[in-house]
Every structure is written in C-alpha cells, then in structure tokens.
Amino acid sequence: MTYEYIPKLIRAALNNDRKNVEAIALLMGRKLRREDPGISEEIMRALACVNTGASVMRSIDISPLPVDKETRNQLAKVDEPLKIEAPILQADVYNQLNEFLRERQLIDKFLEQDIIPPNSILLYGKPGVGKTYIAKWLSYMLNMPLVTLDLASAISSYLGRSGQNIKSLFEFTKSQNVILFLDEIDAIAKKRDDASDLGELKRLVNVLLKELEDCPVTCVIIGATNHPELLDRAIWRRFDREINVSMPALDQRKELLLRGLGSYGSEISKNVFDILLKGTQDFSAADICKMCEHIKRKAVLYPEKNFSICALMEYCELMHPQKKEEKIKICKLLKSCGECESLKSISEITGIPTSSVDRYLK
C-alpha cells in the first residue's frame, strides 16, 4: 500500500516543493504498478509531461489553456471531475438535469437519426442556490473536466481584446473533451441597448452569440447568472435548456440540514431541528450548509453543551433580533423548545439580559 506517502506528498505540494512532489509521485507510481496499474500509468504520464516541459494537463489529454496576449494570464482554470454528492434541488430542476445527462449518454443515437443532441444549459437563480455545484456535479457525472472562464483575465481594457479572448477560449473548448463553464455570464452577455456603450459590449455579445451557435455537439457549455434580467435576449435562444434554480423549499431544506449536520444529526432534538427547518425559509442552500458548519464548530468549541444548545446559539446569532417584538418571539421560541430550562440559559443563548427575558416571557 502507498498510504504512507500521501501525507508527505500533501506537505510537499503545500510547501511548493516541486522536486519532492515529483520524487514521491515517482515512488507511488512504482509501488502501484502491481496493485493498480491504471493509477500507476496515470501518475507516470503526469510525470512524463512535466519532465518534457509540457503542461501536466496533457497527461489527461487536455491541451494548454489559452492565455491573454498582453498579460499572459490563463483565460480559464481547469478542474478535473471529482466525485461529489448529487445536489439537493427541487424535483423539476433535478429532473431536467437528469434528462440532460440521459440525452448526453444517447448522443450517438440522436446523431444516427439526424437529431441534434443538446449541449448547453443556462442556469439562473439567486446567489447560493447551487449553480456552481451543479456544474461540478455534471462534470463528475459526464466525466469531463470543468473549464471555468476567468473573468478577471478574459475581460480586457484594450479594444477588441475581450472578444478575442472569448473566441480563443471557445476554440480551445471545441478541440477538447471538456465542459466550458461561463460563470457570471451576464458580465459578457449584457443587453445591447446601453446608450452609453461605445460598441465594445455589443462586439463582445456578438462574438459570444456566434461562438455559442458554432459549438459542435461534442462540447458542453454551461452558463450561470444571478441576474437573468441583464442578459441579452438573443443569449437565451442559444442555450438548449434554461433552468431556474430556485431557493430550497421545505423538503430540500430538511435534506440539506440532515446532510450538513452529518453524524451530529442524531444528537439534535426534534423541536430544535424544527426551529432550524422553519427558520431557514429564506436561506439559500449555501446559507444552510454554512450554518451547519458553524453549528458543528460550536459543538467542538463548547463540548460541555449539548448539540441542540449549540444549534440554538448559532440560530440566534443568525436571526440577530433587534426589535422588541423579535426578541419576545425568540425568547418564547426558546422557552417552548424544551432545551432552555431557565431564564439564565435563554439569556446566555440570546445575549438578552435576564431581566428582559423575564419581562418578555410574561
């Protein structure tokens, strides 16, 4: 087994010690020849690319990424497909994504019958609903690297350069077996009716429209935006599917809480879980995941407190009651949940003085 090399490899990588990374990887590759020849070959290919001066991405058949001609910065970043759990989404959204995956699996059958297979999705919705997570999950399910547009590098102050950068990135995508992820697509696809625009925005949108139209079916393009109202109308027509990723409903919030709390979920009382469930009505999926992480941290920070109390502490911090009516409501909520036996315990959780808690509960 090669497990003993993993901590050393991680330390060397985090320390930017390329020499040791290569040496440890070589040892692992040799050790794995008998145990797992496929993994061994993958390691050796990566090392061979590095030793010949080629991009390490060539070891997974990915050409070097295009760069901005002026700054020499890469126009995108590549993430290899990694196994992740399926996103927790409302049924209609999940069904559309699964249908897209099935369509991609049947691409040859579509072509045999002269049917154009779909190759693009436009995801839109509020921040934190899971658009980027969906892109990563589709990358895993399709086993295709995810190439994400780097807006900071692609958008240039030089006339015409931004359009050329977008064109270069699409040319790269067309020659590779990858998913191109255009996150914050509204930055390069705004409506062409801005009177103050000198023409650069219109040129950029025109380039994007042409590239989307010319994309072969072997490519997969995912666009994402928090501001669908800003997109040029023609952009919508270039995507095969437009999916509104909505905020999580009650059932999805329950699943997100259970997944986020993990093994701690069995330690939380039903009453407190219900408080979290109802109190996260306006939370995005990212907000709920973040809250769960904070609750688990509190459980480690305050081992003397039971997990339900830690959950209530985080909940009160998030609600942050300011008005008198809000403070009365949260004090009564804590009193009724069965976890807070005294005025003092409610005061400690909420930060409201004991005398005020007493008055609010009368």
Q: What are the residue ranges of the model-derived segments?
A:
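Dynamic helix-loop-helix/coil hinge segments at AAA+ ATPase domain boundaries and subdomain interfaces
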Residues: 15, 78-102, 109
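Walker A/P-loop NTP-binding motif of AAA+ ATPase domains
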Residues: 92-96, 102-271
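C-terminal alpha-helical "lid" subdomain
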Residues: 1-34, 38-86, 255, 259-362
